[in-house]
C-alpha cells in the first residue's frame, strides 16, 4: 500500500509517497499544475508496485484540477477536510508549518485512515456550474447591499428618508422604485421648486414612463414631507454627479444579481430533482436553485444525519460522566451558504404560515413551547433537511433522469 500525500497550493503542489512503518518511497518533491507535470506524477504512481491511494485537502478551488486529472487516470483519490488533517496525530512539541511537512502529514493520515477514505467523485458540470453561480450570487448580493447602504447615506445629505417612500420589490430587470425615484428627484429642491399640482403631474408622467403605479395621495404625501426636509449638500452639478453615480453602480449590480438569479433557475430546471424540490413549501424560483446548488447530489449522502452534518445544523453533544448538557449549540461545521439559504426558507415558512406543512407545524410547536428564535429556526432547518433527503432520494430512485 502506497500513500500519496499532496499538499495543494495555487499553481503547484508538494508530493510525498510513504508506505507502512515509515518507509519512504519518495521524499517530498514539487510539481507544477501543468499537463506535463501531472502526467509525470500519474506515470510515477502507476509505476510503483502495490495499491496506491492519493489524498489531498479540499481547500478552495486549487485542488480540483489535480483531483480531476488523477481520478480520470484511474487512481484512487480522496479529498479530505483540512481540519481532519490538522487535528491528526499532533504529538509533537515542535510547531512546523511548511509544504513539505504538510505533505508528509497528509501521507501519514492516508496510511492511518486507509480503510475509511472516501473516493473523490467528479461532480457533473451542471451541478458544478450551478454551485459557482450560487457563490457569485452571494458575492454580488453583498456588493448590492453595500452599494444600497452607500446610496442611502448619500441621499440622507440631499433628500433624507427618500428611500422609505416605497417598499416595492425588485423587478426582474433589477430596478427598484425608490432607486429610480432618487435618480430623478435626487435633491429636495427638485420637488420644492415646483407647486403641488406641477409635482403631481410630473410624478404621474414619471410613473407612466417608468411603468410604476400612480397614486395621487402618495404624490401629495411626498410633496408635504419634502417641504419640511433640510438638506446638507446644495443642489448643484457636483451633488447630482455623486448621487447619479451611486445610483448607476447600484443598478448595475442589481441587474447582475437578477440575471444570475434567472440563469440559476434555468440551470436548476435541468436537474432531475427540480420538480420535487419546487413542491416544498417555502421554496420558490430563487431559493430552490440556491438550495439545490449547495446540497448537490443528495444520493452521495449515506443517511439523513450526514446531510444535516454537512449543513452544520446537527445538534451538538457535551457529556462527561454523570454530566449531560441539555442545550448544546449546533456544530456549524458545514456550509455557511447552505445554512443561510435554509434560514431564509424557514423565514418564509414563518411569514407565510402554511398550516399543512410539517416543518412549519414543528417550528410553531417549538415557538409555542417558548423556545428562543434561533433554536426553533435551526431545529426547523434540521427537520427540513431530513424531509428533503427522504423525498428527493425516493424521487430519484424512481425517476433518476427526466429525459
Annotated model-derived regions:
Residues 1-403:
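A detector of single, family-specific signature residues
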